[in-house]
Every structure is written in structure tokens, then in C-alpha cells.
Amino acid sequence: MRTAISILVWLGAGWLALESLPANASADPATELTRCAELELRVAGLLRVGTALLYLDQCSDAKRILEPVPKKFSLELARPFRGQDLVATARSTLKQNLALRDDEDLPAPLRCMADAYVDADSGDRYDVVFRPDNGLSMYLNGELLEQCDASSGAEKYFMIWFGEQPFHRRMRDRLLEQALNHSGPASS
């Protein structure tokens, strides 16, 4: 069951429901970035699987989400996920967006980050952070899992969620729309 849920969520099953959360919902207090968007993720509109959050320096940077601007994508889990399922889906989604055939063709920083996923339980939180001067970092519950170099193209890891072929198009669109319409002060 856990594997099926992971695959459905990460591959973007057509019936994954997205619900906006109120602006005062909790966010990571340690971030220097502004929480610009937050969506609850549900399978079939019933089963809550988690919450997706987007952080940017300025919410208007959502227009440049795939450019080398500071950003963070967080996933708060409401269900357990197997790391190997997330690794496989991250690699597959990146290859689709970059028009690559083999895992070995993925640029090193993207492969490094895709391989960082580990098994996680309900209540855990993944944070993927890109800073132009520091590269990519992945955290689980605030603990660093992996840091990958800042070589050219590392920001493209965010294609998983925001590329032309994201794992879920409606989630991408709703997060970006929320960020561009964000008018309140930074949430923390």
C-alpha cells in the first residue's frame, strides 16, 4: 500500500486533489526565504498524503522558478514514503524534462540530489534547497541528508515540481499561481 501511494503521488496520478491552506498555516521558522505557496495533497480527494510548500526570496521569483534564484520546496508527509520510490521517480521526472535516456546521463548535481531520498514516515518533512552559491541541499526534519555542488544547472532539480513535465501539473500551476498572487508579509 505504501509503495502504491508513493507512486501515485510522485507520478502525478490524475486524481490527486490539491487544497489551498490558510496563509497562517505553519512553516519552517529557520528559513530565510518567504513562504509563497502551500497546498495540501490528497489522493482521490480523500486520503491526505502531505503538504507541498514553496519558498522564494521574493514571491515574484516564481516567474523565474527554473532559473538560478534561491528557492526551497518542502514536502510535509502525512503518510510513509519509501526512499527508493522517491529516487526512481525523481530520476524519471528529471530525465523526461531534460530529454535524457539513461540515469547516467543526468548531470552530477541532479543525480546526487535524486539519490538522497531515504525512507520517511508520516510527520516527516523533506526540504530541497537551492542557493546559487551553495548548490543543492536536501534535509529530512532539519537534518542534512545531502549537499550537492553548485555547478551550472543545479537549479534544474526543481524541474521535478515545476518543469514542463512535472510529476503533477496542477500542483505546479497552483503553487506558482499562489506565489505570484502572494501579497502578505513573509510567513515564518
Task: Annotate each PLM feature.
Residues 1-4:
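Positively charged n-region of N-terminal signal peptides that target proteins for export
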